[in-house]
A protein has these predicted regions:
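Conserved catalytic or regulatory cores that recognize and/or transform ribose-phosphate-containing ligands
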Residues: 1-94
Length: 94
């Protein structure tokens, strides 16, 4: 299954470690994982809106979304969650 990881990035300490740990766990279970924390630094010149468009594009190609603890505090993660609900993605939570 293709899984998109969603959670807070902006203003969150150690977000890379949190995303990467979940990626490793999901991959051990045989899933193909899209980790948006990996492209946060690769696309530094994008606006927030452009960054979200990229994330939603990748989420659109996934079967499921994995919501990290505390995702409710993130505007971006809330948008991704809403998109996942609207498009009938499987929703997994930490």
């Amino acid at each position: 299954m293709r899984v998109y990881i969603s959670g807070g990035i902006t203003g969150v300490e150690n977000y890379r470690e949190k995303f990467n740990k979940v990626q490793e766990e999901l991959e051990k279970d045989g899933h193909a994982v899209f980790n948006p924390a990996l492209y946060a630094d690769a696309l530094p010149k994008l606006s927030y809106e452009e960054y979200m468009k990229v994330g939603l594009y990748f989420l659109s190609m996934c079967d499921a979304i994995y919501m990290l603890k505390g995702w409710q505090k993130s505007c971006g993660a809330n948008s991704e969650y809403g998109y996942a609900l609207a498009t009938d993605k499987i929703i997994l939570e930490e």
